[in-house]
Amino acid sequence: MKEEECSPLLSQDTAGREHPLTRNSPPTANIPCPAPWENQKGSWGCRCCPGAKRQASGEGQASSLPLSTGSNCVKYLIFLSNFLFSLPSLLALAAGLWGLTVKRSQGIGWGGPVPTDPMLMLVLGGLVVSVVSLSGCLGAFCENSCLLHWYCGAVLFCLALEALAGVLMVTLWKPLQDSLKYTLHAAIIHYWDDPDLHFLLDQVQLGLQCCGAVSYQDWQQNLYFNCSSPGVQACSLPASCCINPQEDGAVVNTQCGFGALGLDQNVAGQVVFLQGCWPALQEWLRGNTGAIGDCAVAVVMIQGTELLLAACLLRALAVHEAAEDIEAGPL
């Protein structure tokens, strides 16, 4: 090295002695600036992910600061609860997709007389719940603040939608009743057109022990059960209208309602249910208002608890990251 030149990594004092540059020494043009986040491992490519600052760039050693016991409990509680919620939602999603696939293979269209396709509702509900639950599950397990922030936003959005639905249900109760009654009539008319509609209406009639929308005579609106129909089901009713469809046997007698529409009301009342499903549904709602309210409050409380736990975990992760930065010191 020539006498008039100095090393780019060394500085000289007035006596000509060389000594290493200190931390406060100005940078020189010969020293390249290290690339940001160089030599870091474990990052998912997101600045808010936990692995982004877990290793020192020079030493390559991970920080040894663990989460506190309370934060770990919150973390695994969020993971377990959302994992349990994701299982039935994924099952519902799979069942809905299977049902839609079967319907398409049978040539049944997406549109129908009822406002919404039951299988499509099952798919959408299962998809929303599974995506939200899995984001909370993975966000807590991986300590990923990006997913946890998204999870909190999704839960808040669901709570807002539920509050809006409650307000609309109270303010628009009368139009909702009329719409539900119309849906029952439409389901009767198109009973044989959609297997999902067929199944749901049968379950409603069996569960509420009713027949038709307002009375059992509403089945006259169906082309197959109308008394003027030339088919074998003329003046008949579905087996789900029968008081004892199995007739004390193991197999349902699908012909138990044959000819019931042509019978006298007193005679027909011994074979089938005469009350319509709409009055029966109103009576059921009045008798179970308290239970429905308790379920709604429980759902809101569960969502609020999950939101609070996620916020606590986010705060703990922020404090933990700040502590790691302090422990690592300036680079």
Curated annotation (Swiss-Prot):
Primary localization class, coarse: membrane
Paired cysteines (S-S): C210-C277, C211-C241, C227-C235, C242-C256
Protein's membrane topology: Multi-pass membrane protein
Function comment: Part of TspanC8 subgroup, composed of 6 members that interact with the transmembrane metalloprotease ADAM10. This interaction is required for ADAM10 exit from the endoplasmic reticulum and for enzymatic maturation and trafficking to the cell surface as well as substrate specificity. Different TspanC8/ADAM10 complexes have distinct substrates.
Protein known as: Tetraspanin-10
Transmembrane segments: 77-97, 121-141, 153-173
Record CDD domains: oculospanin_like_LEL
Extracellular side: 98-120, 174-331
Topological domain spans for side Cytoplasmic: 1-76, 142-152
Annotated source species: Mus musculus
Gene Ontology terms: biological process: protein maturation
Protein's cellular compartments: Cell membrane
InterPro entries: Tetraspanin/Peripherin, Tetraspanin_EC2_sf
